[in-house]
Swiss-Prot record:
Protein's recorded name: FMN-dependent NADH:quinone oxidoreductase
GO MF annotations, alphabetized: electron transfer activity; FMN binding; oxidoreductase activity, acting on NAD(P)H as acceptor; oxidoreductase activity, acting on NAD(P)H, quinone or similar compound as acceptor
Reaction it catalyzes: 2 a quinone + NADH + H(+) = 2 a 1,4-benzosemiquinone + NAD(+); N,N-dimethyl-1,4-phenylenediamine + anthranilate + 2 NAD(+) = 2-(4-dimethylaminophenyl)diazenylbenzoate + 2 NADH + 2 H(+)
Gene designation per UniProt: azoR
EC code: 1.6.5.-, 1.7.1.17
Subunit structure: Homodimer.
Cofactor field: FMN
Origin species: Azoarcus sp. (strain BH72)
HAMAP family linked: Azoreductase_type1
Cofactor binding description: Binds 1 FMN per subunit.
Family, as annotated: Belongs to the azoreductase type 1 family.
Keyword field: Flavoprotein, FMN, NAD, Oxidoreductase
Root EC class: oxidoreductase
Length: 200
């Protein structure tokens, strides 16, 4: 089993989403001791924004790409290869202003590429990253589970599903900024969610 852990907090140290993601990976390793783990920290190694230069590089013919364009595409190719090689993804996803972090969105923009991780067919789009399981470690300062303000879960289901990943399991750590008692309950709920996710 190949496990890919993506830490998407803007903080490389002390992030609650990373704490919960680490718990997921630790449990997966306990059940699969021969598994390999790759960890990508998007705070320490940020993915560039999908800007005009990036689009120019992606759409330029291979033989006419500049050195900078070739390097930009190669960096995106490496991120895609990590996902393609993974059997399981563990995503540490904090809530920033009711959505995912900019770091996470940049990663999604790098791995979602037509003809590589999805394709358009006569019957509509088809995801090409089938057969993977994703554990999403959600960390929130408040409590939003099941409410209209929880825009992360439908977004993640949509974008991962578009890429062919439909086995997506969510672990919620909420109320983490609402005082010590609420935070303790939030981490306890995350542990319970993880038990259920691993048993699914």
């Amino acid at each position: 089993m190949n496990i890919l852990q993506i830490n998407s907090s803007a903080r490389s140290e002390g992030a609650n989403s990373t704490r919960v993601a680490n718990d997921v990976t630790t449990r997966l390793l306990a059940a699969n001791p021969d598994a390999t783990v790759t960890v990508r920290d998007l705070a320490k190694n940020p993915v560039p924004v999908l800007d005009e230069a990036a689009l120019g590089a992606l759409f330029a013919p291979v033989e006419s790409r500049s050195t900078d364009q070739a390097a930009r595409v190669a960096a995106s190719d490496a991120l895609i290869a990590e996902v393609q090689a993974a059997d399981v993804l563990v995503l540490g996803v904090p809530m920033y202003n009711f959505t995912v972090t900019a770091q996470f969105k940049n990663w999604i923009d790098a791995i979602a590429r037509a003809g590589v991780t999805f394709r358009y067919t006569a019957n509509g789009p088809e995801g090409l990253l089938k057969g993977k399981t994703v554990y999403v470690a959600l960390a929130r300062g408040g409590q939003y589970r099941g409410s209209p303000l929880d825009t992360q879960v439908p977004y993640l289901k949509a974008v991962l599903g578009f890429l062919g990943i439909t086995d997506v399991r969510f672990i919620y750590a909420e109320g983490l900024n609402m005082g010590p008692e609420a935070a303790a309950k939030g981490f306890a709920q995350a542990a319970a969610d993880l038990d259920a996710a691993l048993a699914a």
